[in-house]
Amino acid sequence: TGNKALIASRGPELFEAARQANTRLYFEAAVAGAIPVIRALSGSLRGDRVRQIAGIVNGTTNFILDAMTTRGADYNEALTQAQELGFAEADPSADVEGYDASAKCAIMSSLSFGRWVSVDSVPRQGITTLSTDDIAFAAEQGCVVKLVARAQLRDELGERVLALGVEPTFVPSDHAFASLRGPANGVYVDAEAAGTLAFLGLG
């Protein structure tokens, strides 16, 4: 299934139902479209220790932010163009307010860190309040603005703490995320044995 909201909110029940039916639940399309990040996290990286995930996992918001960055469009102009081209829904709130990216962050985190992560535990901030001034200020700092989903396992006072979030982020212009144009997606996975892996492509 490509229904990321369903997987993120009812995952344990769905996996148990699949187990009882002696079948498998496939959900590669639920995160980052054609990019095989779910396959990697649930397969080749399963025996590794993932330390951090960072991703641009929503094509709608990336298209809007790219239009604001490269063409100087304001938020409403960029959103309208995204809708006209079919990259945004008539009601874009799930995308532009960060709900979609939060669900994908929860799914990737659940696969990576050995614990089920509820979508409600992922703090989120969307892009609806961003202005052309914000984009210009980022450019002055040598950065572009991207909506980034992030999950990191940290040591805090001797305890392993999972830090999660989805928010607009200043990304250095020479970072691979900065080169993702239009509705493209990208995910970076940092693991102890495998090192840093990049998954880039159409979302």
Task: State what each model feature region is.
Residues 68, 77-179, 184-186:
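Substrate-binding/catalytic subdomain of NAD(P)-dependent oxidoreductase enzymes
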Residues 178-192, 196-203:
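Gly/His-enriched, cation/cofactor- and phosphate-binding structural elements
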Residues 3-43:
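Rossmann-fold NAD(P)-binding glycine/threonine-rich loop
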Residues 55-63, 97-101:
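Conserved phosphate/anionic-ligand binding catalytic regions in large, soluble enzymes, centered on
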Residues 1-2, 8, 25-29, 52-55, ...:
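General beta-strand structural signal in soluble alpha/beta enzymes
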Residues 37-50, 61-73, 103-117:
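Oxidoreductase and adenylate-handling cofactor-binding alpha/beta cores
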Residues 51-52, 89-97, 199-202:
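A short glycine-threonine-serine/GTX helix/turn-capping micro-motif
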Residues 50-60, 127, 199-201:
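NAD(P)-dependent dehydrogenases' Rossmann-like dinucleotide-binding region
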